[in-house]
Amino acid sequence: LEKFHETNYRQGQETQGIKKEIFYWALEFATEYEFDNNSFIYKLKHKIADKLVYITIRENFGVLELIVSGGAAIQPRLARFFNCLGLRIFEGYGLTETSPVIAVSTNEKGGRKVGTVGPPLAGVEVKIDSANNEILCRGKNVMLGYYKAPDLTAEVIDSEGWFHTGDTGKLED
């Protein structure tokens, strides 16, 4: 996503005059994208930016309508940019030990929020260790243990069955 954004930015820099100004305005507008902003002025600005800039960028994606990311957190500016273009970004979180997803954003109202990964999947429990803000989870998706390594398993799965991810986080409503 970063490289695609950079490529489009460079292409915009090569334009001249009013086209360049409109391009920069549309990019700036995209960095302020809000999922649930329904004001008339916001919608009008978005429609103008879409007709003048975003539609051309979106053509590079063909029929692609959504992107699911889970390898690393997406920078908020990129998440806003691609969502503003009309390419829905869904962020997920998990580890190999959790087969591999714990939580993923959804398409429901309020289900996607920049900088978050969404609610836990059905059947997955998540909590935050108050001592160090570590993300803990348990569910049928979590491994039973490391193969022939009970000592390693005991380091990451406690007596109540909570898998300690080693990552820090927080829960939001």
Identify the function of each model-found stretch.
Residues A103, V114-G115, E160-G161:
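Short, intrinsically disordered/low-complexity patches at protein termini
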Residues P120-D129, N133-D173:
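Conserved ATP-binding/catalytic segment of the ANL
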Residues E2-R112:
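Gly/Ser/Thr-rich phosphate-binding loop
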